[in-house]
Amino acid sequence: MKKQDFLFIFVLVIIFLPFFVSESIYDWYKSFNAAHGMVMSFIKFGILATLGEMLGLRISAGVYNRKGFGVLPRAVVWGLLGMGINAAMIIFSKGVPQFMEYMGMANAVAIINGEFCLDKLWIALTISVAMNTIFAPVFMTFHKITDTHILMCGGSLKSCLLYTSPSPRDGLLSR
């Protein structure tokens, strides 16, 4: 392990340690998360998914960051994607049981909110299949587009926001 690996582990410990050592911090986190789900989705995805991408870069290239990788733009994009994922979870977890009732399943909404049973498992599986077939392809396409955009902008947040696509007269598209 290199020095950067110990630093990465140290950052993870600093992020998660307060939740284990302080009941009041953990209680505050749970109440803030319940009251401000979208804000917390942005923060959690922004931090954790970006750390995951950095870990992936470490595995594939041997470093946690490099020129053009764009840690900050990736964190912003992941934060926005996290908000979309949160919205999709809400929409599908509420909408699919309603749709199942519309299609003839009795009490799907009550079942998904009740004790575990095989019908609840069936509803949960249906929610998962619906979300992964309807939402996931759009999500993955958008994520690929944003990754490409970040790389095209050299990983700079300012460049990502002010980037204009090349015009055919620039000669960039004909190469």
Residue ranges and their predicted role:
Residues 26-33, 99-102:
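Membrane-interface helix termini and inter-helical loops of multi-pass transporters
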Residues 61-87:
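Hydrophobic/aromatic-rich structural module bridging two neighboring secondary-structure elements via a short loop
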Residues 1-11:
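N-terminal membrane topogenic signal
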Residues 96-121, 157-159:
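Membrane-interface interhelical connector segments
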